[in-house]
From Swiss-Prot:
Residues 344-359 have a biased composition (Polar residues). Residues 342-371 are annotated as: Disordered. Residues 189-450 form the NR LBD domain. This is Protein tailless.
Length: 452
């Protein structure tokens, strides 16, 4: 097999993920076409050589007993090839049978792998973020915390429960975001039903005294030890789902056109995931995660890249932990990441170059960069990005007056997150769970509440 003809770059800048060269894609049989659509096959599936797409389609159709109807007026005559294979499911399934796919091989195959994401979708379908309980965490400590993370054990607040008293400064109650942010942003976490809260006119909320007293009587779980790899993946999947619910709670975001919502979600899910890991899952057993991943992945080139990016991931988590980020700062960082003025491939110095923000319109190229990636409401997105930065800047001035560089430091950590590719997170935490489905497709379906 030809090794590196054309030598494509490992990193696809548009999607911040890995493009596999022919040498790296050892599963693809470039000389053996799929008998269904004539794309490159990946081996024998259900009795014939087929690509992953057609094999997955056949498996889902048989397991779910799908009955498709041909969309063409000429029943059963639709073209099924690489370009048109998704246009008519009835004809695609018919061709699968015609070329020899064996449905009994699907029925006698073991059931689908435990899909944490789909199970969480069922468990939390109508729940607000934080309404559910965290999965039970094993009591065994697998490795020493300080040795893995570089700092002693850090309290890990559990999502869905208030963080421990003293974790956030008392001056948080005095925070008032700037009026410019109030007019556009609603960054408050989703309201938990049946708990009275005092809603300020700025969109942030602070609990009433009665609510705080009620929470004080609620037993908080102990700080969990380092989790086993499978439990890290389980909890990571739950946070992925809760991130989607958090995004749904941001009023200004949901008022954007749906294509803009999906594009921004696709570009920011990675930063949301990293922030959730820092806020709720430190310290994390990366050593075991890498060990498990290496045992399942024989490609040394990919393994080396994932290992390097894990170090960048750990560096981001360490910095966020040492900065003692409070919940308001985390919300502002999420909003800054969500209302991204430029795609991830843009200059990584944009935020630092604009770190002396006031409440102006931002850099002159921000709207153009937003338009170039297809945003329908690029002006609104740029304005909300600036307002989120203003909210963070003014909050830090009020609450950390002795740390004049804190704002720039936090924006620097946001830029550092770009060093961790979506591919690495997808491979390390979700590949075994989601199979051939891309994480972007899965998140988009979750957000749109479409059945997967």
């Amino acid at each position: 097999m030809q090794s590196s003809e054309g030598s494509p770059d490992m990193m696809d800048q548009k999607y911040n993920s890995v493009r596999l060269s022919p040498a790296a894609s050892s599963r693809i049989l470039y000389h053996v076409p799929c008998k269904v659509c004539r794309d490159h096959s990946s081996g024998k599936h259900y009795g014939i050589y087929a690509c992953d797409g057609c094999a997955g389609f056949f498996k889902r159709s048989i397991r779910r007993s799908r009955q498709y109807v041909c969309k063409s007026q000429k029943q059963g005559l639709c073209v099924v090839d690489k370009t048109h294979r998704n246009q008519c499911r009835a004809c695609r399934l018919r061709k699968c049978f015609e070329v020899g796919m064996n449905k009994d091989a699907v029925q006698h195959e073991r059931g689908p792998r435990n899909s944490t994401l789909r199970r969480h979708m069922a468990m939390y379908k109508d729940a607000m973020m934080g309404a559910g309980e965290m999965p039970q965490i094993p009591a065994e400590i697998l490795m020493n915390t300080a040795a893995l993370t570089g700092f002693p054990g850090v309290p890990m607040p559990m999502p869905g429960l208030p963080q421990r008293a003293g974790h956030h400064p008392a001056h948080m109650a005095a925070f008032q975001p700037p009026p410019s942010a109030a007019a556009v942003l609603d960054l408050s976490v989703p309201r938990v039903p049946h708990h009275p809260v005092h809603q300020g006119h700025h969109g942030f909320f602070s609990p009433t005294a009665a609510y705080m007293n009620a929470l004080a009587t609620r037993a908080l779980p102990p700080t969990p030890p380092l989790m086993a790899a499978e439990h890290i993946k389980e909890t990571a999947a739950e946070h992925l789902f809760k991130n989607v619910n958090w995004i749904k709670s941001v009023r200004a975001f949901t008022e954007l056109p749906m294509p803009d919502q999906l594009l921004l979600l696709e570009e920011s899910w990675k930063e949301f995931f990293i922030l959730a890991m820092a806020q709720y899952l430190m310290p994390m057993n990366f050593a075991q995660l890498l060990f498990v991943y290496e045992s399942e992945n024989a490609n040394r080139e990919i393994m080396g890249m994932v290992t390097r990016e894990v170090h960048a991931f750990q560096e981001v988590l360490n910095q966020l932990c040492h900065l003692n980020i409070d919940s308001t700062e985390y919300e502002c960082l999420r909003a800054i990441s969500l209302f991204r003025k430029s795609p991830p491939s843009a200059s990584s110095t944009e935020d630092l170059a604009n770190s002396s923000i006031l409440t102006g319109s931002g850099s002159p190229n921000s709207s153009a960069s937003a338009e170039s990636r297809g945003l329908l409401e690029s002006g609104k997105v740029a304005a909300m990005h600036n307002d989120a930065r203003s909210a963070l800047h003014n909050y830090i001035q009020r609450t950390h007056p002795s740390q004049p560089m804190r704002f720039q430091t936090l924006l620097g950590v946001v830029q550092l997150m770009h060093k961790v590719s979506s591919f690495t997170i997808e491979e390390l935490f979700f590949r075994k769970t989601i199979g051939d489905i891309t994480i972007v497709r899965l998140i988009s379906d979750m957000y749109s509440q479409r059945k997967i």
